[in-house]
Amino acid sequence: MARANGRSQNLRDKLDGNELDLSLSDLSEVPVRDLVAIPKATALDLSCNKLTTLPDDFCNLSHIVRLDLSKNQIVQLPSEFGRLMNLQHLDLLQNHLMSLPVSFAQLKSLKWLDLKDNPLKPDLAKVAGDCLDEKQCKECAQRVLQYMKSVQSDHEIELQRKLQLDKERKKKLEAKQRVKEEQEREMRKRKKQQQKERKRRDYNAMQEAERALNSNKKAEEEPTENHKRMATPKEKKLAQRQSRLRKIACILLFGLLVVLLVVVACRFTDLKAINMCTSVNAIYKETLSALHSNPVLERFLQDPSSQ
């Protein structure tokens, strides 16, 4: 801290009114902190040194009105150089400048400018002119400020264009991301549906297998309707014949039962006195007489009245 104060005091020793002369001091960098401590120095001469750049915090010296940077090796001014709002006189003679920062357009107080003997770009060199006298240096300041305002406008347009492109690119990326996420959702949904379908098919197959197993068990226990339908023509003909015989047997049995009932009625009830029963009893007796010759049947057909 004492060392910094010492350097500041050394600079104050070089202060003459509001002018601070640091020319021919073999400086390779600007002592910005020491200069900030001397706001009274509104005119700063840094000519004939070994400066190649100016630090960014040099732009904090907004109190400077007159600045001489001639005959150095400066290749580029700080990007925020336009913050030196009070700067009116700027000498950049014999440096290595090719261009000026866009913020240079903000030096609205600038009245005098010398850019001679710099490797300026053609457009800027044409605007700057020769600056051979006071009048030309004043005109140089006006033309360069106007030119830099145009550059600033183009820069802002380009910046807006880049921002718009970035915005559109971001939108496209977001849209692409949404499409990707939607595809992933559809894929997950389709995969889930496929799993569900596979489970359903497995379940149906299992149910079908169980039904087939139950059907086989039932087929082993008793003939199914399918087996019946698959009977051979010979079996069908035999079944039809048996059916007819059963029907005939039923008819005969029914007729025999009717005859038996009539005989019983005529033999053992009061109806035996009527003419029909008389005939029935006569036929019955004749039949018994014909069958008495058979000893086996005689026992069953014996006249109950004789017992």
Curated annotation (Swiss-Prot):
Q: Which UniProt keywords apply?
A: Coiled coil, Endoplasmic reticulum, Leucine-rich repeat, Membrane, Microsome, Nucleus, Repeat, Signal-anchor, Transmembrane, Transmembrane helix
Where's it mainly located? membrane
Q: Does the keyword Phosphoprotein apply?
A: no
Q: Which residues form a coiled coil?
A: 156-222
What SUPFAM superfamilies would the database entry show?
L domain-like (SSF52058)
InterPro entries recorded for this chain? Leu-rich_rpt, Leu-rich_rpt_typical-subtyp, LRR-SigEffector_domain, LRR_dom_sf
Stretches of Basic and acidic residues bias are at: 174-187, 194-238
Gene Ontology cellular-component terms for this entry are: endoplasmic reticulum membrane; nuclear envelope
**Which regions does the record annotate with the repeat LRR?**
10-31, 40-61, 63-84, 86-107, 109-131
- One matching Pfam family: LRR_8
What protein name applies here? Answer: Leucine-rich repeat-containing protein 59
Originating species? Xenopus laevis (African clawed frog)
